[in-house]
Amino acid sequence: MSVGCACPGCSSKSFKLYSPKEPPNGNAFPPFHPGTMLDRDVGPTPMYPPTYLEPGIGRHTPYGNQTDYRIFELNKRLQNWTEECDNLWWDAFTTEFFEDDAMLTITFCLEDGPKRYTIGRTLIPRYFRSIFEGGATELYYVLKHPKEAFHSNFVSLDCDQGSMVTQHGKPMFTQVCVEGRLYLEFMFDDMMRIKTWHFSIRQHRELIPRSILAMHAQDPQMLDQLSKNITRCGLSNSTLNYLRLCVILEPMQELMSRHKTYSLSPRDCLKTCLFQKWQRMVAPPAEPTRQQPSKRRKRKMSGGSTMSSGGGNTNNSNSKKKSPASTFALSSQVPDVMVVGEPTLMGGEFGDEDERLITRLENTQFDAANGIDDEDSFNNSPALGANSPWNSKPPSSQESKSENPTSQASQ
C-alpha cells in the first residue's frame, strides 16, 4: 500500500515508511486479509523478505532510522492482537516497547474543556487494552514527515502530522482517524524503548463506507443513527472512563507498590507514604558549598636569618614564653579572633615550651584606620621583645666610620 502525492518535488517516502502493511525499507509484507488476526502465540509469524533480515544479502542501504523501525514493529505487534490476548500479553507488549519509568500523556479537548491525562508504566498496558475493549478491532499509527533529533541519552521523534487509526466493527464498520501531534522519546541503546509518549489530539474523523449508506438510504431512523459519532474526540467511552480512573489510580501506585513489597495494611502504607512526603517537604534545602580561602604561600627565610635565629635561640626563649600570654590577652579583647598554633620549623624539638604561636586576626568589625596613630599599642606589642631585631636602630654614619679603622688595623 503506497499513497503518492501529486505535488511536484514532493515525496511520499515518509508516509510509506510508516505504513502498517509495509516494512520501513518499502518491501511489501505478505498479503494481509481483514478479519484474520495473527497471534505470535497461536501461529507462526510470517517470514520477512531476505533483504529485511540479513544486511549482506541484496540490501545496499540500511532499513531506515531505528525510530521508524520501532514504530513499524509496534504496529506489527498490535496487528497480532486477538480477543484471547490477556493481561500477560499486554504486559509483554508494554515491556517490549516502553521503559520501566515510561510516561504516557494524552491531551484533547472535550465539550467541558481541555483534558490532560498522564499515566505511568504500570497503567500503560490497560490503556492500549481499553482501546480494543471499546470496540476497535485494529489499531495502528501513521506518521507523516516526522523530525528526528539526537540528544545525549535519547532520540526524540516529533511528528506534527501523526494519526492514530482504529477500525470498529460494531455497531457497524467504521474507521476512526485521530489526527494530532505525536512526540516520542526513545532511549539511545540497543532496545530503543519509549521513555516519553505525548499525543496531542487536534481533530478526528469517522469514516463509513458508502455501501452502508446506500443500504439504509430509505430508513430515516438508521440514517439518524449513522450520523452520530461512536467516539468522543476519537476515543471510545471505555478509554475515556479508564483515563478518568487513572486520575485516582496513578497517585495510588506508590501505595500499591509498598503494599505488595512490605505486605503492609493500606492504612499503614498511607501513613508511611505521608510521613516520607512530609519529611521531603520539611527537610531544609542544602546549603551552598562555601569556597575555601586560598592558602597563603609560606615564604622561605634566607640563610642569614636562619643563622641568626639559630644563634639567638636561647636568648629568645623568654620572648617565646611570653608570647602565648600576650596573644591570649589580645584575643580576649578583640571579638571574633582566630588563633592558629603551628610548631616551629627551624631547630628545636617539638614540645610545649618550644613552640611558635602565630596569631591571625580576621575581624570584619575591626577598623584598621583606628590603630594607625596608636603608638602605645604598637610599642606594647609582644613582637617587640628585648632582643627583637625590630628594636635595634641602624648604626649612624659616624659609628660606621669609627669601626672601619679598627677593622683595617686588625687586618
Swiss-Prot record:
Superkingdom of source: Eukaryota
Record's comment on post-translational modification: Ubiquitinated by RLIM/RNF12, leading to its degradation by the proteasome.
PANTHER family according to UniProt: LIM DOMAIN-BINDING PROTEIN
Localization per Swiss-Prot or TrEMBL: Nucleus
UniProt KW Phosphoprotein keyword: yes
GO aspect biological process, one term: gastrulation with mouth forming second
Species of provenance: Homo sapiens (Human)
GO cellular component terms listed in the entry, alphabetical order: beta-catenin-TCF complex; cell leading edge; chromatin; nucleoplasm; nucleus; protein-containing complex; transcription regulator complex
Record carries keyword Transcription: no
Modification Phosphoserine, positions: 265, 302
Protein name per its UniProtKB record: LIM domain-binding protein 1
Residues carrying Phosphothreonine: 61
Additional free-text comment from the UniProt record: Acts as a negative coregulator of ESR1-mediated transcription in breast cancer cells.
Main subcellular location: nucleus
Biased composition (Low complexity): 302-318
Function (record text): Binds to the LIM domain of a wide variety of LIM domain-containing transcription factors. May regulate the transcriptional activity of LIM-containing proteins by determining specific partner interactions. Plays a role in the development of interneurons and motor neurons in cooperation with LHX3 and ISL1. Acts synergistically with LHX1/LIM1 in axis formation and activation of gene expression. Acts with LMO2 in the regulation of red blood cell development, maintaining erythroid precursors in an immature state.
Sequence similarity: Belongs to the LDB family.
LIM interaction domain (LID) domain segment(s): 336-375
A GO molecular-function annotation: RNA polymerase II-specific DNA-binding transcription factor binding
Subunit note: Interacts with ESR1. Forms homodimers and heterodimers. Interacts with and activates LHX1/LIM1. Interacts with the LIM domains of ISL1 and LMO2. Can assemble in a complex with LMO2 and TAL1/SCL but does not interact with TAL1/SCL directly. Strongly interacts with the LIM2 domain of LMX1A and more weakly with the LIM1 domain. Homodimerization is not required for, and does not effect, LMX1A-binding. Component of a nuclear TAL-1 complex composed at least of CBFA2T3, LDB1, TAL1 and TCF3. Interacts with LHX6 and LHX9.
